[in-house]
Amino acid sequence: MLTKRIIPCLDVTAGRVVKGVNFVGLRDAGDPVEIAKRYDTQGADELTFLDITATSDGRDLILHIIEDVASQVFIPLTVGGGVRTVADVRRLLNAGADKVSMNSSAVANPDLVSDAAAYYGSQCIVVAIDAKQTEAGNWEVFTHGGRTATGMDVVEWAKEVAKRGAGEILLTSINRDGSKDGFDLALTAAVSDAVSLPVIASGGVGNLQHLVDGITKGHADAVLAASICHYSEYTVGQAKEYMAAQGIPVRI
């Protein structure tokens, strides 16, 4: 088994890190630079920054925040929110991002995935998929911070972006977001088993066993965490020690 990653996720709006439940009810979690430095010290493998209202509010990229973080933190940074063009990808990479995440814009224009991967390589293109379970038991793709239904099937969309050259999929269960009930393991496994590229599980971590389950039962290659880390319930180091004790290879 390859080394598995723990990736703290920093949802950003108005220059602050926030956390909500089911993508709403946001509460302040702190300054993005200070939180990023803390996670770097704790041994996080990567960090993900998502400007969760950039697309819906029509705002520009969070370049200044990424420049500040990249000057003080020395682990890979994935950045998303408001990415609309290949030029936006370049601007974020120049600001210090190692990977760029696209979500709503990829649904609106799937060629953006293909074009960005062709220009910059699949290794730095992440497609974020926000999934909500339907009454029929399937999962539908939602965009614009979970507010807009697309009618698209999550597994089929994952296959499409994989064919178009995405390097990773960041898969979030809207139903589980902030719930602390654990990942939607059926969703995570369905997507992970359908594509050959790495899948990052997101949405619902409430304890350290949930991280283990995301890997062993959800077949994810990495696990994203926000609530349990932002409010100091657990450190990244504690999470890695727990996962290692369960036989999961992690970078200590």
From Swiss-Prot:
E.C. numbers: 4.3.2.10
InterPro entries referenced in this protein's UniProt entry, alphabetically: Aldolase_TIM, His_biosynth, HisF, IGPS_HisA/HisF, RibuloseP-bd_barrel
Record bears the keyword Lyase: yes
One BP term from GO: L-histidine biosynthetic process
Pathway per the UniProt entry: Amino-acid biosynthesis; L-histidine biosynthesis; L-histidine from 5-phospho-alpha-D-ribose 1-diphosphate: step 5/9
Molecular-function annotations in GO: imidazoleglycerol-phosphate synthase activity; lyase activity
One cellular component (GO) term of this entry: cytoplasm
Subcellular location: Cytoplasm
Active site: D11, D130
Family: Belongs to the HisA/HisF family.
UniProt subunit comment: Heterodimer of HisH and HisF.
HAMAP family named among the record's database cross-references: HisF (MF_01013)
Task of the protein: IGPS catalyzes the conversion of PRFAR and glutamine to IGP, AICAR and glutamate. The HisF subunit catalyzes the cyclization activity that produces IGP and AICAR from PRFAR using the ammonia provided by the HisH subunit.
Protein name from the UniProt record: Imidazole glycerol phosphate synthase subunit HisF
Lineage: Bacteria, Pseudomonadati, Pseudomonadota, Betaproteobacteria, Burkholderiales
